[in-house]
Amino acid sequence: MGKTLFDKVWNKHVLTGKEGDPQLLYIDLHLIHEVTSPQAFEGLRLQNRQLRRPDLTYATLDHNVPTVDIFNIKDEIANKQITTLQKNAKAFGVHIFDMGSDEQGIVHMVGPETGLTQPGKTIVCGDSHTATHGAFGAIAFGIGTSEVEHVFATQSLWQTKPKNLKIEVNGKLPTGVYAKDIILHLINQHGVDFGTGYALEFSGETIRSLSMEARMTICNMAIEAGAKYGMMAPDETTFEYVKGRPYATNYKYDIDAWRELYTDEDAEFDRVITLDVTDLEPQVTWGTNPEMGVSFNTPFPEIQNVNDERAYNYMGLQPGQKAEDIDLGYVFLGSCTNARLSDLVEASHVVKGNKVHPNITAIVVPGSRTVKIEAEKLGLDKIFKDAGFDWREPGCSMCLGMNPDQVPNGVHCASTSNRNFEGRQGKGARTHLVSPAMAAAAAINGKFVDVRKVVV
């Protein structure tokens, strides 16, 4: 019987352990940031240990970094976390993409941009959205702080192999519909737990037609479907993306092995889901988890359970309303889901020549300094600023309420991020997940509009 892509990569990294039992996996790349690493470093000190492989460990600063004045960190806890990582990186010999560096940015942006993220690797990070890197054909997953320490000390991790779930996506995406809409629709249709216990492999002609940046958007939100892992088979698009990047120094030697990373034709999956995107519409979430979403022209559903009732109360909405009825106050273009160059380009097409609605506060936060530099070379900063957007420095920003960028209590925000939980963007903030183009159109119109009519 053939093997799935996931099984092939997993099996190559097993150090010990029987099939069906927890197995010890070798970790090829460990990415860290300032929030989940301090206690892990302290654990090493208490045990008088060093990092097993500092050369396979890379740090960046992202969650707490201010996006207006990056060196003016007013919050004491945030400042301590940042300075602690800077000191720990120096003490333990870890390369850090520090504040002010041209390579600093959100951890799931930095890995791919530098070429650290490569097909066939096992990649971990103390962050929920590590599956982003699975778009390259890597096994990438988020871990907790105690596991961060375990990888520091041993460069390995005990894991139980999940089942395999194939998501086959076919059809041509309509104009104005994007990768973000694919993953939001899948979660809306199948729930926030359909991937629990599975490794997701996204495949099909639609996936193969996507850019690497669009593929990363889909894998980024695998965790919102309950899955620890999301993967796509690497192909020529992948190889061209990796080629020439600073840390892809063995490209010409590795590419032959990468070409073997695919699911065999006779491989069996434990479950298969199919999706035809030919008639897919732009998606908007109305509630407090990514499952609570609708296609743009679909009314919000009737209350089915206590979770729906609570979500409607929190969001200040009612069944039967539509996305265009939402009274928006903020628009956020950013996060590790949708703050790449192509995302900003898509949004700029909508924004160019227009002005932000007077009722809207709109900010753009490039996901990394690399993206910011490239965007400014293209003049995107001028397009956004001329329209009335705030053009910020890189960081996690308004994706989560851990830094100065927060949505006020009770205000609705069109956001390109990945989570719309209660209080995710600040106390009482009401988050609506959409694609960059949808967010941009909302900023201009002061409400959600059908972006397909804007970008035609």
Swiss-Prot record:
CDD domains: IPMI. Gene3D superfamilies: Aconitase, domain 3. Binds 1 [4Fe-4S] cluster per subunit. GO terms for biological process: L-leucine biosynthetic process. InterPro entries: 3-IsopropMal_deHydase_lsu, Acnase/IPM_dHydase_lsu_aba_1/3, Acoase/IPM_deHydtase_lsu_aba, Aconitase_4Fe-4S_BS, Aconitase_4Fe-4S_dom, IPM_dehydratase_rel_enz, IPMI_cat. GO terms for molecular function: 3-isopropylmalate dehydratase activity; 4 iron, 4 sulfur cluster binding; metal ion binding. Pathway: Amino-acid biosynthesis; L-leucine biosynthesis; L-leucine from 3-methyl-2-oxobutanoate: step 2/4. Its EC number is 4.2.1.33. HAMAP family: LeuC_type1. Heterodimer of LeuC and LeuD. This is 3-isopropylmalate dehydratase large subunit. It comes from Staphylococcus saprophyticus subsp. saprophyticus (strain ATCC 15305 / DSM 20229 / NCIMB 8711 / NCTC 7292 / S-41).
